[in-house]
Amino acid sequence: MDVVSLDKPFMYFEEIDNELDYEPESANEVAKKLPYQGQLKLLLGELFFLSKLQRHGILDGATVVYIGSAPGTHIRYLRDHFYNLGMIIKWMLIDGRHHDPILNGLRDVTLVTRFVDEEYLRSIKKQLHPSKIILISDVRSKRGGNEPSTADLLSNYALQNVMISILNPVASSLKWRCPFPDQWIKDFYIPHGNKMLQPFAPSYSAEMRLLSIYTGENMRLTRVTKSDVVNYEKKMYYLNKIVRNKVVVNFDYPNQEYDYFHMYFMLRTVYCNKTFPTTKAKVLFLQQSIFRFLNIPTTSTEKVSHEPIQRKISSKNSMSKNRNSKRSVRGNK
């Protein structure tokens, strides 16, 4: 891994200041993966999102409706964390698949084994009235093959729009991965929100979380066009290929790899029910508790490549401009 000096990670898609055309040989790279990496990715993003709502006074007294929640192992950590902080939260976890038994027997957690449609969403809204709802969606349908097609994605995003329209949540975190240019079908709409990037996503994943806080007005929609799709692909490939493969040398932490740097900036915003001498001590405590919960071993920084000059990532693309390829990034998860 090469080294770099950075002040902060890219937290949101709009902050990515460079792009790179996809290189087909990337598909042959052996991906480095942690145990339970998918649960770790979800846990960090949702802990960051819910802590933000806590900071704004939105979380306490809410019902979290999580659609597409199974297996949901990580949700037990979230539930326990906010319960120990004295937050009064109810959880409704809905999925056609079964949940991890670790979620059984909790009075504040309702498990529903079914898929949602418009009629069921209306029944949820009626059942929970007048509670304020926080919506988390991780819906993912695949009608064939190993990865969702563009038709699958458009169906999922239409369903997420219906969720917002019917449930009228105070805030939402939605699954968002732009279709690939060579699989384009038509323009479509998604809710307006901040496109949060995810540490520990698969190596070439183009998935983000779409975070929104609603202030009473009607849901604002953003149109996604084919030119947007090309922009998404190039920026996410730059992030995954260049940025996420760096070691941040000015980051004083046991593991200086970029994803840990990204995680640090997420966890520093999280409230704890104990005091720490430094922000680093708090983040280490949180990381260790999360990794212990998910049975993820602690790792040190991967061996870095020799680089005589440590420099910040340039805002200008230093790669060749003649690397166009018709092949798309295939990190769907």
Swiss-Prot record:
Q: Where does the record say this protein resides?
A: Virion
Positions that bind mRNA: Y22, R177, C178, P179, F180, D182, S205, A206, E207, E233
Q: CDD domains, from UniProt? A: capping_2-OMTase_Poxviridae
Principal localization? virion
Q: Where is this region: Binding to Rap94?
A: 169-333
Instruction: Cite the entry's keywords alphabetically.
Output: Elongation factor, Methyltransferase, mRNA capping, mRNA processing, Protein biosynthesis, S-adenosyl-L-methionine, Transcription, Transferase, Virion
GO molecular function terms attached to this record: mRNA (nucleoside-2'-O-)-methyltransferase activity
The question of whether Protein biosynthesis is a record keyword is answered with: yes
| Main EC class the enzyme belongs to | transferase
Origin, by domain of life?
Answer: Viruses
Annotated positions binding S-adenosyl-L-methionine: Q39, Y66, G68, G72, D95, R97, V116, D138
What chemistry does it catalyse, as a reaction equation? a 5'-end (N(7)-methyl 5'-triphosphoguanosine)-ribonucleoside in mRNA + S-adenosyl-L-methionine = a 5'-end (N(7)-methyl 5'-triphosphoguanosine)-(2'-O-methyl-ribonucleoside) in mRNA + S-adenosyl-L-homocysteine + H(+)
Q: Where is the active site?
A: K175 (for methyltransferase activity)
What SUPFAM superfamilies would the database entry show? S-adenosyl-L-methionine-dependent methyltransferases
Provide the GO biological process annotations: 7-methylguanosine mRNA capping; methylation; regulation of mRNA 3'-end processing
Task: Mark out the compositionally biased spans (Low complexity).
Answer: 311-322
> Which residue ranges does the record annotate as region Binding to NPH-I?
169-249
User: Which InterPro entries does UniProt cross-reference here?
Assistant: mRNA_MeTrfase-like, Pox/kineto_cap_MeTfrase, Poxvir_cap_MeTfrase, SAM-dependent_MTases_sf
Biased composition of type Basic residues is found at: 323-333
Annotated region Disordered: the residues are: 305-333
Give the Gene3D superfamilies listed for this entry: Vaccinia Virus protein VP39
Q: For this protein, what is the EC number?
A: 2.1.1.57
Main function: Displays methyltransferase, positive regulation of the poly(A) polymerase and transcription elongation activities. Involved in the modification of both mRNA ends and in intermediate and late gene positive transcription elongation. At the mRNAs 5' end, methylates the ribose 2' OH group of the first transcribed nucleotide, thereby producing a 2'-O-methylpurine cap. At the 3' end, functions as a processivity factor which stimulates the activity of the viral poly(A) polymerase OPG063 that creates mRNA's poly(A) tail.
- What does the subunit section of this Swiss-Prot or TrEMBL entry state? Interacts with poly(A) polymerase catalytic subunit OPG063. Interacts with OPG109 and OPG123; these interactions might help linking transcription to capping and polyadenylation.
Name the family: Belongs to the class I-like SAM-binding methyltransferase superfamily. Poxvirus/kinetoplastid 2'-O-MTase family.
Mind telling me what this protein is named? Answer: Cap-specific mRNA (nucleoside-2'-O-)-methyltransferase
Q: Which organism is it from?
A: Vaccinia virus (strain Copenhagen) (VACV)
Gene of origin? OPG102
